[in-house]
């Protein structure tokens, strides 16, 4: 259920907000990798969640840009 809720929230964002969210999630992913390398990470499931959210946001971003291109 939580994933579908986050997808609904992502669809409400504009292109600038999507870009900011992608940057933030990529930073979080970097931090997780760093913690894993230093053996401080206990919640390894977050990798999958963040990667999925980045993919969803990239898909939304591309679909929004495609719809803007066709409408122009």
From Swiss-Prot:
An individual GO BP term: translation
Gene Ontology, cellular component aspect: cytosolic large ribosomal subunit
Alphabetical list of InterPro entries matching this protein: Ribosomal_protein_uL29, Ribosomal_uL29, Ribosomal_uL29_sf
Gene Ontology terms for molecular function: structural constituent of ribosome
Disulfide cross-links: none
Keywords: Ribonucleoprotein, Ribosomal protein
Residues making up the signal peptide according to the UniProt record: none
Pfam families assigned to the protein according to its UniProt record, in alphabetical order: Ribosomal_L29
Protein family (similarity comment): Belongs to the universal ribosomal protein uL29 family.
Database matches in PANTHER family: 60S RIBOSOMAL PROTEIN L35/50S RIBOSOMAL PROTEIN L29 (PTHR10916), LARGE RIBOSOMAL SUBUNIT PROTEIN UL29C (PTHR10916:SF0)
Protein name (record): Large ribosomal subunit protein uL29
Gene field: rpmC
């Amino acid at each position: 259920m939580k994933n579908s809720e986050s997808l609904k929230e992502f669809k409400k964002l504009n292109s600038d907000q999507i870009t900011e969210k992608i940057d933030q999630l990529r930073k979080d992913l970097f931090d997780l990798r760093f913690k894993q390398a230093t053996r401080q990470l206990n919640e390894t499931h977050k990798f999958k969640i963040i990667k999925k959210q980045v993919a969803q946001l990239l898909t939304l971003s591309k679909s929004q840009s495609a719809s803007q291109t066709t409408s122009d």
